[in-house]
UniProtKB/Swiss-Prot annotation:
Quaternary structure, from the entry: The middle cell wall layer is composed of subunits of the middle cell wall protein. These proteins form a hexagonal array with a lattice constant of 14.5 nM in the middle cell wall layers.
Keywords in alphabetical order: Cell wall, Repeat, S-layer, Secreted, Signal
Signal peptide: 1-23
Top-level taxonomic group: Bacteria
Pfam families named among the record's database cross-references: SLH
Full protein name: Middle cell wall protein
Function: The middle wall protein binds to peptidoglycan and to the outer cell wall protein.
Residues annotated as domain SLH: 26-89, 90-153, 154-203
GO cellular component terms, semicolon-separated: extracellular region; S-layer
Localization, UniProt: Secreted, Cell wall, S-layer
Length: 1053
């Protein structure tokens, strides 16, 4: 029996000469095929024989049932009687089969041949579903075996079908048969020897012949294992595959194969292969084939000889006369009998001989020594283990070997190999590929697919249009011909958290994700900013891989299963962010951490709580060693508006929490003010003097008040800004730092007015997610039009939904330097989903936050070119000035842009502080008088008109003084446990507002052994022998009415 050995280290050649990702099962889940591999082979084989057809869309309905008419058609075709069916179209055999029915001729012929039989009422019931019992009965009759069947139907027919290997284990004979099962039974029947009547008259006799449906009726030449045995030959006499498209492109077509079969009676012939057969799978092997005799002979089935051993593995070690052989320059033909190859995974060795055929990277070598010299040299020089397909002869020696360099990267050797590379962009029209490193592969331009080049995806024939961004690809050359190219791509991607990083040597790092380990070699690439910058991993950059422990990554694997490209889940500007200190550091005695607040370049204010060992100075030394005094941090980590303003780099861990802080040392620090700054800053060319402003430059608006009254300094209202806004002002005082690339590292705006940043206004369409970020789509003003735009959020869309922001609400928002909506700054200007009124407008605080100068509500009574006359709640008429650039939003009917307003519309009119002039910029239509009458919304309309923006306290708003959850630590001293917890007041709560602090342990109020309240930080301790089940800290406001609680969970220190 043939053995096919697939090494786990092989290139997943899987009976193919095409390299493909062996680790495909380790990739992200993909859609399963609708047919398994065996079923697909069966269907394609039957289709090539003209017996079955699909629905024209790649579907064959293998899980559907089949009618009696359809099944009769199949059997008639299998008997080669299709032409007779055309002549029998107008016979009247059954009462319910009309001559106009497409199946009439097939049913009539099947009946005439006694393959099918009707019912006592002379009907055929063509639309009835065929049962398993009926199906095997018709097939047994078609094969001529009905005279040999004895017993009661249907068991007798089922037994005969099992005996003939047509169908086994039919347990539900009266159930409707599926098309897939019918196809399998018919396929099994094709090779069954036919039974025919050989004597007639009174002495009727039947005999089993040497003919089959294939050979007698379908005109198919069969050369398979049975043929070899019956003809007195052996498997060596089966045809040998001597040329396939991946090697002989140009000499044979993409759908052809050349066979050498003198003993098989087919000579050296090139055949067309049916759809679904990948001839490249069988190069160098003896094969079994069915060849349909037609105008153009077509191979409808092909499989390897079951007596030939084919091994899929990787090249290990070459030995010559028992010694390791790595210098092949003196190798000669006389050495072949003593040359052995040990395969990498199986560790078995096989000997070459003078008849061994050698192919290397799809190039055939007439002299095997020439090919082996190249293979041995390249394999040794690169430290690779190339993929190999090995075919053994009857003496267990290598008859054929195809070695593929599926591991080298960035190779550009025309006629040999290009790649591997990672696809960044595909131009299907020009057949051009842009790589992740921005290099381009243009050699396919002007070439004809299928004639001048072939494409394979995961080892199977594909189209150039199937190639996508993120795939790893290499290009080889058919038989070394520079004009005949082979593009091999894989789409194996592994995503998950790195559990472990292991280094075997300076050129072998391994990443463990789940229960799988993946190897990274020098030459692979890395990106942690969404592939804006792609870094080669070389001897100077292994730290990029070494630092991936506990990170979520995407690994793009090459054909051998090695890592070709690494992407972190989050971009570097999400994980490593420049920041400024906004609240001074203080030492937390209960956690041994330094706690302070920062504002990141993304506009997020974050509380940092880190041990000294995770805080690094300008020289990369942490404050827990290297003679560093961590007490200095109290004087260093403070907010400032001077030239000594500290720029930090905060690294977030996989959970988005600060895990490391580094001080960024500037090369230069400069300061300019007023007109001098305005002249220096060029927003058009993105320059500050001679220094370039890049997309990585951090811009901070630090014009808020620096409070120094308490021990902990705090910078109020710190925000981020855009360079174009900062560069366009002439009343600012600005500090900027420069790095060693003459780029502006950071800009600190420390004094000045008018830098609030323009507010955006828009009508909410929906929320979504793209590129790993939550998004919001809005209709917003663009000049005098309303356009649809999608923004990424800098936070969670659920935070907006929690504020009851929904579709059709009108909001004000700002975007940060990355054009992401700052979630914390979103203001719901008009709540269209409010209960009890047509729409609810924001209060004075909301107007201030949204930078709205004026906002009114009203019922439109008249409209002129530049004036809207409206009525208020008291039916007083008022006028509102509008302009040509005023835009109109429909918040209740058609949504989005409105053409204007009409008498009877209920409106909200807004004058934005960001747009010059006092005329109204936005008119929002929330309903109309007709709708109010129809839906009986008079009360809602009255409530709407009574609104006047004012500061209104929310009676349901609770005093939010503490975080909801706090983690404390406990230690044991004999039977006594010492519980300690620290909690910081929320940023908007002042320490002087707190009147009382209480501690509850296991549901009871207790007196803490330690209670310290300083600079807004509460430290509390309690000693007891009891085990904690629940605990909380409660604070009460000085008004005596408001209180807040924090649940404390204790973990062992």
């Amino acid at each position: 029996m043939k053995k096919v050995v697939n090494s786990v280290l092989a290139s997943a050649l899987a009976l193919t000469v095409a390299p493909m990702a062996f680790a495909a099962e380790e990739a992200a889940t993909t859609t399963a095929p609708k047919m398994d591999a065996d079923m697909e082979k069966t269907v394609k084989r039957l289709e090539a024989l003209g017996l079955v057809a699909g629905y024209g869309n790649g579907e064959y309905g293998v899980d559907k049932t089949i009618t009696r008419a359809e099944f009769a058609t199949l059997v008639v075709r299998a008997r080669g009687l299709e032409q007779g069916a055309k002549l029998a179209q107008f016979s009247n055999t059954y009462t319910d089969v009309k001559s106009t029915d497409w199946f009439a001729g097939f049913v009539n012929v099947a009946s005439g041949e006694e393959i099918v039989k009707g019912f006592p009422d002379k009907s055929f019931k063509p639309q009835n579903q065929v049962t398993y019992a009926e199906a095997v009965t018709m097939i047994v009759r078609a094969l001529g075996y009905e005279p040999s069947v004895k017993g009661v139907w249907p068991n007798s027919m089922i037994s005969k079908a099992s005996e003939l290997n047509i169908a086994r284990s039919i347990t539900t004979p009266n159930n409707a048969a599926t098309r897939g099962d019918i196809f399998k039974m018919l396929d099994n029947a094709l090779r069954v020897d036919l039974m025919e009547q050989v004597e007639f008259g009174t002495d009727i006799r039947h005999e089993i012949t040497k003919e089959t449906l294939l050979t007698k009726y379908l005109k198919v030449t069969v050369r398979d294992m049975e043929w070899a045995q019956e003809a007195g030959n052996d498997s060596e006499d089966l045809p040998l595959v001597t040329n396939v498209p991946a090697i002989g492109l140009g000499k044979i077509k993409a759908n052809e194969v050349t066979l050498n079969g003198k003993d098989a009676g087919i000579g050296n012939t090139t055949y067309k292969v049916a759809d679904g057969i990948n001839a490249n799978d069988f190069d160098g092997q003896h094969v079994q084939v069915w060849i349909k005799d037609d105008k153009e002979d077509v191979i409808v089935w092909m499989e390897g000889s079951t007596d030939q051993e084919v091994i899929m593995d990787r090249v290990g070690e070459f030995t010559l006369k028992g010694k390791t052989f790595e210098d092949p320059k003196d190798l000669s033909n006389s050495d072949l009998a003593d040359l052995k190859l040990e395969l990498d995974a199986s560790e078995k060795s096989y000997r070459f001989n003078k008849n061994t055929k050698v192919t290397y990277n799809f190039t055939r070598f007439n002299d095997p020594v020439d090919g082996l010299k190249e293979i041995i040299k390249d394999n040794a020089d690169g430290g690779f283990t190339f993929g190999a397909k090995v075919v053994l002869d009857n003496n267990n020696e290598i008859a054929y070997i195809h070695v593929i360099d599926d591991q080298s990267m960035n190779k550009e050797d025309e006629g040999v190999k290009y790649g591997s590379e990672v696809i960044s962009k595909i131009d299907t029209d020009k057949k051009k590929i842009t790589n992740r490193d921005n290099d381009k592969f243009n050699d396919l331009d002007g070439k004809e697919e299928g004639k001048d080049f072939l494409v394979f995806l995961n080892g199977k024939p594909a189209k150039f249009s199937d190639l996508k961004e993120g795939m790893v690809y290499s290009v080889y050359y058919a038989d070394g011909d520079e004009d005949k190219l082979l593009v091999f791509a894989t789409d194996t991607v592994v995503e998950g958290k790195v559990d472990k990083v292991v280094s075997r040597n300076n050129n072998d790092y391994r990443l463990t994700i789940g229960d799988k380990t993946y190897r990274v070699y020098e030459g692979a690439t890395f990106s942690d900013d969404g592939n804006k910058d792609v870094q080669d991993i070389d001897k100077d950059h292994w730290d990029l891989v070494d630092s991936l422990d506990d990170e979520t990554v995407k690994l793009y694997l090459d054909a051998s299963g090695r890592v070709r490209h690494i992407e972190t889940k989050d971009a570097i500007d999400d994980r490593k962010q420049k920041a400024i200190v906004t609240r001074s550091a203080t030492f937390n005695t209960s956690k041994d951490t330094w706690d302070f607040r920062v504002l990141t370049q993304k506009g997020k204010e974050i509380t940092v709580s880190l041990e000294a060992k995770n805080i690094y100075d300008f020289d990369g030394k942490n404050f827990s060693r290297d003679n560093k005094n961590q007490d200095d941090l109290e004087d260093i980590l403070v907010p400032s508006k001077d030239k000594d303003t500290l720029l930090l780099e905060v690294t977030l861990d996989a959970d988005g929490k600060p895990g490391k802080v580094e001080f960024l040392k500037p090369v230069k620090v400069e300061q300019e003010s007023g007109k001098a700054w305005d002249d220096l800053a060029d927003e058009d060319d993105d320059m500050v003097g001679d220094y370039e402003v890049t997309d990585k430059t951090a811009v901070f608006n630090m014009t808020g008040k620096l409070e120094e009254s308490s021990k902990r300094k705090e910078l109020k209202n710190a925000k981020t800004a855009k360079f174009k806004d900062v560069a366009d002002e002439n009343d600012l005082s600005v500090i900027y730092t420069v790095n060693d690339k003459d780029e502006v590292e950071a800009i600190f705006v420390v004094e000045g007015d008018g830098l609030t940043g323009d507010a955006h206004y828009g009508q909410v369409i929906d929320f979504g997610r793209k590129g790993g970020k939550d998004t919001i789509r809005v209709w917003e003003k663009d000049g005098d039009k309303v356009v649809e735009k999608e923004y990424k959020l800098d936070g969670d869309q659920d935070d907006l939904k929690d504020e009851d922001i929904r579709r059709n609400d009108f909001i004000a928002f700002t975007v940060d330097s990355n054009d992401e909506v700052v979630v914390d700054d979103v203001v719901e200007v008009v709540n269209k989903n409010a209960k009890g009124m047509l729409a609810e407008v924001t209060d004075e605080k909301g107007m201030k936050d949204a930078n709205i100068d004026k906002m009114v509500v009203g019922l439109v009574s008249d409209v002129s070119k530049d004036t809207i006359t409206y009525k208020d709640a008291d039916d007083n008429k008022k006028k509102a000035s509008i302009k040509s650039a005023t835009v109109y939003f429909d918040l209740y009917d058609d949504f989005g842009e409105a053409d204007g307003v009409n008498e009877g519309d209920y409106v909200v009119m807004i004058d934005s502080g960001d747009i010059s002039g006092t005329k109204y910029d936005y008119v929002l239509i929330v309903s109309d008088a007709k709708t109010v009458r129809k839906d009986k919304l008079e009360d809602d309309a009255e409530a709407f008109l009574k609104q006047e923006p004012s500061e209104k306290p929310d009676p349901d708003t609770k005093w939010d003084a503490l975080p909801s959850k706090v983690e404390g630590k406990f230690t044991s001293a004999g039977p006594v446990k010492l519980y300690r917890a620290t909690v910081e007041l929320n940023s908007k709560v002042k320490a002087e507002d707190v009147d009382a602090i209480e501690f509850y342990f296991n549901g009871k109020k207790v007196e803490p052994s330690l209670l310290n309240f300083k600079d807004g930080v509460i430290t509390i301790g309690y000693n007891t022998e009891d085990k904690v089940t629940s605990s909380k800290i409660k604070v009460t406001n000085k008004n005596g009415k408001d209180s807040d609680e924090a649940t404390v969970t204790f973990v062992e220190a």
